[in-house]
Amino acid sequence: MEATFATAAAFQSIVGALRGLLTHATFDCDAHGMRLHSLDVERVALADLRLRRAGFARYACERKLSFSVPVRGLVKIVRTADPSAPLTMRVAARDDRVRLAYETARRAVSCTLAQISLDADRLGVPDKEYTCVLAVPSAELTRACADLARLGATTVEMSSGTTGLSFAAHADDGVRVRVLLRGSPQRPLTQAFACCYLNKLARASALSETVDVCMDASMPLRLRFRLGPLGALDLYLAPRVPSVGESAQ
């Protein structure tokens, strides 16, 4: 498999979004593109990244293959690349290393990253339509989640309704806070989530100007970041049922 990103910046943003959530990344490759499908260590959040063949500057994959790498190592390599330079990833079926390379007018750099062996989870993702889908500015979602974390909230109630999307939580020192992100009217629905995980997922906001916040009483929260012709990143978070005395009632 050989995949060339038109600019390293595209892959840098994707890897940066996953850095605080995943310890390892498992990629599945075929003739149509690449897919990352990995759970976090605590099995609370799921990342589902789909990169289409048409979105790469060059892509070739003659046979299906899968490989897993440590996210920290991938971050270290990708960060060294010139953001404007093309970045190429190569993986061979019988090679235990992933090869990444980029070059500019003045230098050429190649690195390898050892693959890791693990029993990768292949969990399904919801395939039915969500009842509530709100498109909100990514930066505002990040700011709301970061503010709640700074105030000391542990559990956050997210609610959709006639005015948009709201966040409510009890925080440290008797503080109660509510943040409203205005949007199109939606069916009333409230779910509770761990603030620390919401904050991690919202950090992917650098990927796109807007994010689709998808809620349904019978499914996990989904944050969908669209990557233009390259594809999309879906981040899923299981709801939490707060116990008595926790921050959101």
Curated annotation (Swiss-Prot):
SUPFAM superfamilies in the record: DNA clamp
Entry keyword annotation includes Disulfide bond: no
Organism from which the protein derives: Orgyia pseudotsugata multicapsid polyhedrosis virus (OpMNPV)
Physiological role: Sliding clamp subunit. Responsible for tethering the catalytic subunit of DNA polymerase to DNA during high-speed replication.
Gene from which this protein is expressed: PCNA
One example GO MF annotation: DNA polymerase processivity factor activity
Entries under CDD domains matching the protein: PCNA
Protein name (database record): Probable DNA polymerase sliding clamp
Signal peptide span: none
Annotation: DNA-binding region: 60-79
Family: Belongs to the PCNA family.
Keywords: DNA replication, DNA-binding, Early protein
Transcription is among the record's keywords: no
PANTHER family: PROLIFERATING CELL NUCLEAR ANTIGEN
GO biological process, one term: leading strand elongation
Pfam families, A to Z: PCNA_C (PF02747), PCNA_N (PF00705)
Domain of life of the source: Viruses
